[in-house]
Design a protein with these regions (language model features):
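Bacterial Sec-pathway N-terminal export signals of envelope proteins
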Residues: 21-70, 76-77, 116-117, 131, ...
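Acidic, low-complexity, intrinsically disordered peripheral segments
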Residues: 75, 422-460
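Periplasmic alpha-helical coiled-coil/stalk elements that build and connect Gram-negative outer-membrane
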Residues: 24, 145-259, 370, 374, ...
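N-terminal signal peptide c-region/cleavage motif recognized by signal peptidases
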Residues: 15-18
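Bacterial N-terminal signal peptides that target proteins for export
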Residues: 1-9
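Amphipathic alpha-helical coiled-coil segments
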Residues: 42-57, 144, 148-167, 178, ...
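Small/polar, glycine/serine/threonine/aspartate-rich low-complexity segments that form flexible
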Residues: 68-112, 241-250, 282, 295-331, ...
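A glycine-/polar-enriched beta->alpha junction
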Residues: 31-41, 48-63, 99-104, 111-129, ...
Length: 460
């Protein structure tokens, strides 16, 4: 039985183990993460403030109606001097003095006030802040959703690569085990030197150690993905891309940078932070110090009881409708200081926006260029893998006829394993870099994940 036969056996064994696990695709992992990831749950809860803030903004310019009412015990004494009195049949009198007295009486009162803002720059700025804050909540939720999507893809392919590494190592292990048995048998027959036996056994011990480490790595990656998706780690099995789509590479790099200007969540959130600071400055500017309201009021105060002159009662009814102007005359420099502080914060936010634009553009360039180079790397590694397999076949045949040593066979087997893993890693990098590119431009959504999910399902 040759090396290639053992390789086929190893592949069948790995396929059996995979069938006992729950093979999930990328979209299934994403759907599980939506309802399970704790960080995303926090962002989704925060997203709930969006509509209430929009309602608050709309309510700021609606009428405000207030009713106050009260009842209790009290006293009411008045003394009037120098009053003028005139009445039918009583003539006219000047310098009249009169008093009223209620020392222990019951009181009740009510007042109804309606106010409609007409001119209030501070209120207008507060309204804009509420609307911007609602937009910011939307962006924070969108950024968290995109971050989770990227994180799921990275953790998913971390597991897929760990499982592939374990598969390749187990394949090598079986091949070297078979070779070690063959070397011992041939040594006992005197057909090979003892060094061939030692070389194969040393290589076997090394691979066994690598397999143990790879098994631990698989369990670790399973646990991480399980924590994100809520699926059982014992049942997880991730798929690898059968082919790699270059659909996102069809868009030129400069177009990606341009789209990031308006789509990047980081840039958009920092832009809103600057606008919020500018609205805060408007609240304390000179033009915002004056406000004009339409106001209507009606009220009644009543008290009745006994006093110095016997039983008595007093009622006062009032009402008015008109305009009310409010102008702060002196605030001790508080308003100007708050305005200056807000403007400095706006300048800081503008600088952060410029920095974010630069960093996003740099990241897009690096990612896009890596993708362009990665396409050629995948092609080169595919050819290298085919060459390594042909070399292994030739080396195995040469070993059987005595032209190649056991060490040559082991090295050829190592080359095939290394080429397989390098190609797999290159394909995964191409997928992840395209997902990262979409995230940088704020374009990462389920449609992007579906592109690469189809590539995985095509070969499974």
């Amino acid at each position: 039985m040759g090396i290639r036969a053992v390789s086929i056996s190893a592949c069948l064994m790995m396929a059996f183990h995979a069938s006992s696990a729950q093979a999930i695709d990328l979209m299934e992992a994403w759907q599980g993460a939506i309802g399970n990831d704790r960080a995303y749950a926090v962002a989704e809860a925060g997203h709930g403030v969006t509509v209430p803030r929009q309602k608050q903004a709309a309510a700021l310019w609606r009428p405000n109606v207030m009713l106050n009412a009260g009842a209790g015990y009290g006293r009411d004494n008045t003394d009037t001097r120098g009053a003028y009195f005139a009445g039918p049949g009583f003539g006219q009198s000047e310098d009249i003095a009169f008093s009223t007295s209620v020392n222990s009486g019951t009181t009740h009162n009510w007042a109804l006030t309606a106010t409609q803002p007409l001119y209030d720059p501070k209120r207008r700025a507060e309204q804009q802040q509420l609307l911007m804050s609602a937009d910011q909540s939307d962006l924070e939720w969108g950024a968290a959703r995109q971050s989770l999507m990227l994180g799921v893809a990275e953790r998913y392919f971390d597991l897929a690569l760990a499982q592939e590494s374990l598969r390749v190592l187990q394949q090598q292990k079986q091949a070297v085990e078979k070779l070690a048995v063959e070397m011992r048998d041939r040594f006992q027959l005197g057909a090979t030197p003892i060094t061939d036996t030692h070389e194969s056994e040393a290589r076997l011990a090394s691979i066994q150690a690598q397999v143990l480490y790879a098994e631990m790595e698989v369990e670790t990656r399973k646990s991480v993905l399980a924590d994100t998706t809520g699926l059982s780690s014992e049942q997880l099995f991730a798929l690898l891309p059968y082919r790699v789509s270059d659909e996102l590479l069809q868009t030129p790099m400069e177009q990606w940078i341009s789209e990031a200007e308006s789509g990047s969540f980081d840039i958009r959130m920092k832009t809103i932070a600057g606008n919020l600071a500018r609205q805060e400055a408007k609240k304390f500017g000179l033009e915002s110090s004056v406000k004009l309201d339409a106001i209507a009021q009606a009220g009644r105060d009543y008290i009745s009881g006994s006093g110095d002159f016997g039983s008595a009662s007093n009622a006062q009814t009032s009402g008015m409708i008109g305009l009310q102007v409010s102008v702060p005359l002196f605030t001790g420099g508080y308003r100007s200081a708050r305005e200056e502080e807000a403007m400095r914060l706006a300048d800081k936010a503008d600088a952060e926006v410029a920095l974010a634009r630069q960093q996003v553009a740099q990241s897009i360039r690096a990612t896009w260029l890596n993708l362009k180079a990665g396409s050629g790397r995948v092609q080169a590694l595919t050819q290298a893998l085919e060459a390594s397999r042909l070399r292994l076949d030739a080396t195995t045949l040469g070993h059987q006829v005595g032209d190649r040593t056991t060490l040559d066979v082991i090295n050829a087997e190592n080359d095939v394993a290394s080429a397989e893993l390098a190609l797999t890693q290159a394909k995964v990098n191409q997928v992840l870099n395209q997902i990262r590119l979409a995230a940088l431009a704020g374009k990462l959504d389920e449609s992007v994940l579906n592109i690469f999910n189809r590539d995985m399902l095509a070969g499974n």
